[in-house]
Amino acid sequence: MVSCGNHSEEKNTSTEIEEVKPQKEFPVLDSSRYNVGFLIMDGVFNTELTAPFDIFQHTIFRKNIKAMNVFTVANTDDYITSFEGMKIIPDYNYLSDSIPKIDILVVPSAEHHLDSDLEDEAMLSFIKKTDRDAQFVTSHCDGAFVLAKAGLLNESVSTTFPSDINTMRTMFPTLDIRKEVLFVHDGKYITSAGGAKSFEAALYLCEFLYGKEIAQELAGGLVIDWNLNEIPHTIIEKK
């Protein structure tokens, strides 16, 4: 005897849950301010990033000046890890996001700025593109190597971390690289020795833009004694 029954297919009651990534949130930028972009990557050194970031961010507390929007730019949406282990989520990804016009580009030093980072064509291309419209491009410590590799310092005097000056002169023998100064300002380029002296280079740019009184107020807010005349530096006067 053959029995014919109703054979219904078992329904798959399991539910697959798709991972939904949260929508990326970008900084709210005040259009009346300078846009200051900090180029960061794995191995960035804390001080060269946070020193100028602190100075520039504090401009929003000064009255009657064109203050600064500060934000970070990297080649990833994931966090980057600084040399000292601090994890930072970049505000913008220059490989995929629409980057706002950057008025001041800051290139802090990173662990591989003397080797593998100099072969990063996408990063160098971003720097060159940003340089075209930027009012200032600044570097701290070995960030100068990146600017040099991008060709930005070909016609400019510069400096870098004191113990790396000879290395930079060897790698870029046609450049005029100064020693025994904490920063050099030549045209739109400001290069600094880095380390804790990154504060001085950032304060100098603020004094250049806003005047001595504002620079001293910014310095005082971070308990820094500021007197440009006491800082070893070079300013190249353009004819």
Residue ranges, per PLM feature:
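A conserved active-site-flanking secondary-structure segment within enzyme catalytic domains
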Residues: 154-180
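Extended, subdomain-level signal for the structured scaffold at the beginning of enzyme domains
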Residues: 4-137, 145-148, 166, 179, ...
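Short acidic alpha-helix initiation/capping motifs at coil-to-helix transition points
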Residues: 194-198
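Conserved Rossmann-fold dehydrogenase catalytic segment
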Residues: 178-193, 223-227
